[in-house]
Each structure stands twice: as C-alpha cells, then as structure tokens.
C-alpha cells in the first residue's frame, strides 16, 4: 500500500509556481495512459508515487484540472484565501461531503 501525503479536500500549493489548489482525487501511482514529457520527467521513478487530481484557478479565476506528482505539491497552512474564495468553498464542500454519511436506498 502506498501512503499519500495529502488527502481529498485538502488545500495544497504548487511548489514551483505557487498556485493554490484543492485535491479532488488521488491515484496511488501515475495512471494516465500515455504520459507526456510535461507530466512525467525523464525520471521514471516518479510514476510509482502518488499523483493528485488538483483543481486550481487560472489568471482569470477559471477552474483548471491538473494532474500533479506528490513531489510538486506542498502543504498550505492558511485556510482562508480572500483572493481565491471559490477554492476555499470547494475544499470545505468536499470535506463536508466526506464527513457526512449519506443514506442509500
């Protein structure tokens, strides 16, 4: 079993670019069919570590779905981000959905 550093609904920050994001899904290892050079560097060992589906915002505030290696992400300590409140809302919504049990018929 591979342990992941981040969890679904957690806010993270891209280490190189500094963008704020929210983890929406986790793959135990790289799982896209054909990796491009941008997605996986020449070091193939990155494929064996967790990869994260992360929602970030572009410069216009529109959501972008990204697929990032664990090594590219860092912890985000601040919970409230007035400049990107939609990401705060998304993170809170995901966390509430994961905590609240749902009845299924």
Curated annotation (Swiss-Prot):
Coiled coil: none annotated. It comes from the Bacteria. SMART domains: YccV-like. Its main location: cytoplasm. One of its GO terms (biological process) is response to heat. GO terms for cellular component: cytoplasm. The keyword Cell inner membrane does not apply. Gene3D superfamilies: Hemimethylated DNA-binding domain. Belongs to the HspQ family. This is Heat shock protein HspQ. It comes from Blochmanniella floridana. The lineage of its organism: Bacteria, Pseudomonadati, Pseudomonadota, Gammaproteobacteria, Enterobacterales. The gene is hspQ.
């Amino acid at each position: 079993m591979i342990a992941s550093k981040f969890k679904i609904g957690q806010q993270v920050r891209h280490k190189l670019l500094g963008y704020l994001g929210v983890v929406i899904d986790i793959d135990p290892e790289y799982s896209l069919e054909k990796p491009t050079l941008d997605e996986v560097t020449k070091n193939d060992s990155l494929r064996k570590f967790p990869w994260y589906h992360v929602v970030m915002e572009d410069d216009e505030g529109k959501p972008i779905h990204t697929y990032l290696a664990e090594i590219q992400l860092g912890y985000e300590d601040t919970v409230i981000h007035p400049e990107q409140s939609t990401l705060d809302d998304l993170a809170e919504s995901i966390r509430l959905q994961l905590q609240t049990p749902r009845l299924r018929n």
